[in-house]
Amino acid sequence: MVEFKLKDPLLDQLFEAVLLLENVDECYRFFEDICTVAELKAMAQRLEVAKMLQAEKTYGEIAERTGASTATISRVKRCLNYGADGYKLVLERLKSETAADRRQQLCSRDLSSSLGTRKKT
């Protein structure tokens, strides 16, 4: 079991509140109230940096695409290698969800195609 360095009741409450959000629109509403634009952009940037590091992109490619400094890229890389595996957990789930979404779209398209090609009797 991972021991969390930041564990405290206020953070527990915050994370429980986040878990209550049901969709992206609700996330926008909550995070726009609780974070500054700069804080949100920084978190989004770090997630993209982690994604690109996992894809073995170079620091130069990452900096150019995201605008992240090499210090930020290094911090994210350190977390990927030695952190609590939070980035890995989320990126794997995002990848799985994206794959599941693609499968769902393909199934829907295939179903629509097969229904559209049936002869009417």
Listing of model-derived features with the role each one plays in the protein:
Residues R78-R93:
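Short, solvent-exposed alpha-helical "recognition" segments
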Residues D25-Q45:
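Short, Lys/Arg-enriched anionic-surface-contact patches
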Residues M1-L21:
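General nucleic-acid-binding
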Residues M43-K57:
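Short, amphipathic alpha-helical "recognition" segments used to contact nucleic acids or chromatin
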Residues V90-T121:
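Intrinsically disordered, low-complexity basic tails/linkers immediately adjacent to helix-turn-helix/homeobox/MYB/SANT
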